[in-house]
Design a protein with these regions (language model features):
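Alpha-helical transmembrane segments
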Residues: 47, 78-79, 153-164, 276-288, ...
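Predominantly late transmembrane helices and immediately cytosolic-facing juxtamembrane segments
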Residues: 172, 286-289, 356-391
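Structural signature of hydrophobic alpha-helical transmembrane segments
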Residues: 1, 42-54, 152-165, 215-229, ...
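Central hydrophobic cores of alpha-helical transmembrane segments in multi-pass inner-membrane proteins
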Residues: 2-11, 28-30, 51-61, 160, ...
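Juxtamembrane/interfacial segments at transmembrane-helix boundaries in multi-pass membrane proteins
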Residues: 84-175, 205-223, 271, 296-315, ...
Length: 481
């Protein structure tokens, strides 16, 4: 869906090298689809790296005044992380191939390491081995050679995968390339970067890092969850300090994607489902914010909040659309953002993570509302103090058509989320099972349901937590471990 909308949103903003621009868009789409669909680790790496070139061109050729520096910083950051991942992929290839034919096939590698992960799970349960510094304190005779190798070198392989994906997310403190890239990128680059490309990082954790190294993921769980919460709070405070609208939206991505990582590393059914839902939410909401600001930038060629004020008087349709998307971004009940953040926070509170992390993440929701509503008030309301704003034209037909699909998704995903949750639940069940040291965990109670209020809810036997927006969340009893 995003590809045609990106073309529609950029229709009048790109007037140089138009053919090359669309070629770069198509190449980027191909690379992203290839990375998502790959069931071969080496092929995944090729597509994961191939994304860099067209995005580098989108920023470096069609970006703003500092586009070269932004493009180079983006390229170098992600390249360094990816090279470490390549080393880890080769290590996994040789490790999983012990005693059999070596392959980069996902299923072959996962199944090849499954037995070793089972051994490690039993060893850890019996406390005869450790996932700490690996000083040789475990009993080698109890483990197969593959399990010993995985226990000894697995943390470094997990770290290599995790660093590559953390840069792509991006997580604090390897996030510094993102604000500059977003600010300098054209509207198409920002939309694709926010809506899809950043999710390659969270997708990588979900599909590769945690399933291949469940014990190591548990070992790093406190660190990654802490960095996720730091990113949530840090991103919110950085947004409060911004005067550049596009940079504010960019830092909000750091905060929102922190919720995705927190839910993923809560290792609960609610957290996993909420994390996946939040990935979709961020793509819809932040992609729409960048697109709408791109429409405004085409008219004024200015990114500072102080250059606007009172434009709701001259652009009422644009204002209404922007406010709806803002409500989605701050997780107002009835919008898509509420479902994802609620499930993530619920999963975090039910997990074994320190309570302080869950409280800090919950507090940051208020900060998110503060910086977004502050920006809306500064830009759209008050007096028309700048003469240039009086002649601004409201959205045209093309721009309205490009925005309506985003608005529809915001409302449908917020009011009727069950059809998406039904799709996400099986993946969440598999993720929780694979995170349980590769063991066959009981995931029968991982299924998450959200029902519209009605007679059936009143008759339900389970207690329900009722929240605004005509939504009921049935209580979930499982720890999902």
């Amino acid at each position: 869906m995003l590809g045609p909308l990106v073309v529609l949103a950029s229709w009048s903003s790109i007037d140089e090298r138009v053919k090359e621009f669309h070629v770069a868009l198509l190449l980027l789409q191909t690379a992203m689809l290839g990375a998502i669909c790959s069931i071969d680790l080496l092929l995944f790496y090729v597509f994961f790296e191939a994304m860099l070139v067209p995005m580098y061109l989108l920023i470096g050729v069609w970006g703003s005044t500092e586009r070269q520096a932004a493009a180079m910083k983006f390229f170098l950051y992600t390249l360094v992380g990816s090279l470490l991942m390549l080393i880890a992929i080769l290590a996994v290839y040789f490790l999983a191939g012990q005693g059999g034919a070596r392959s980069f096939d996902y299923a072959s590698i996962y199944n090849g390491m499954l037995g070793a992960n089972h051994e490690i799970a039993q060893c850890l349960a019996a406390k005869t081995c450790d996932t700490g510094i690996f000083s040789g304190s475990f009993h080698n005779e109890q483990l197969s050679p593959m399990a010993v190798a995985l226990l000894r070198y697995g943390p470094w392989m997990f770290f290599a995968f995790a660093l590559a994906f953390a840069i792509k997310v991006p997580m604090f403190p390897v996030h510094t390339w993102l604000p500059l890239a977003h600010v300098q990128a054209p509207v198409a680059g920002s939309m694709i970067l926010a809506a899809v490309m950043l999710k390659m990082g969270t997708f990588g954790f979900w599909r590769f890092a945690v399933p291949f190294f469940p014990a190591m993921a548990r070992m790093y769980q406190p660190l990654i969850a802490t960095l996720a919460v730091i990113g949530i709070v840090y991103g919110a405070f950085m947004c409060l300090a911004q005067t550049d609208i596009k940079k504010l939206i960019a830092y909000s991505s750091v905060s929102h994607l922190g919720y995705c990582m927190l839910g993923m590393f809560a290792f609960t059914g609610e957290g996993a489902t909420g994390s996946a839902y939040q990935m979709l939410n961020h793509g819809v909401s932040t992609g729409a914010l960048f697109m709408l600001f791109g429409f405004l930038y085409e008219r004024r060629h200015d990114r500072l909040m102080s250059s606007f004020g009172g434009i709701a008087k001259v652009m009422p349709v644009f204002t209404a659309f922007f406010v709806i998307v803002t409500f989605s971004s701050i997780a107002v009940p009835g919008t898509n953002g509420f479902i994802g953040e609620f499930l993530v926070l619920l999963g975090s509170f039910k997990s074994n993570l320190p309570l302080a992390l869950s409280i800090a993440a919950t507090t940051a929701v208020v900060l998110g509302a503060a910086y977004m509503l502050w920006m809306v008030q500064k830009v759209f309301f008050g007096q028309l103090t700048h003469e240039a704003n009086r002649s601004l034209k409201d959205l045209g037909r093309r721009e309205v058509f490009a925005t309506l699909p985003f608005l529809a998704l915001i409302l449908v995903m917020g009011l009727k989320p069950q059809f998406i949750l039904d799709v996400l639940n099986p993946s969440s069940q598999k993720y929780i099972a694979r995170a349980a040291y590769g063991a066959d965990a009981d995931t029968s109670k991982v299924h998450i349901t959200v029902r519209t209020l009605g007679p059936a809810v009143a008759e339900a036997a389970q207690p329900h937590l009722l929240v605004p927006g005509a939504i009921a969340f049935p209580s979930l009893q499982a720890r999902d471990r």
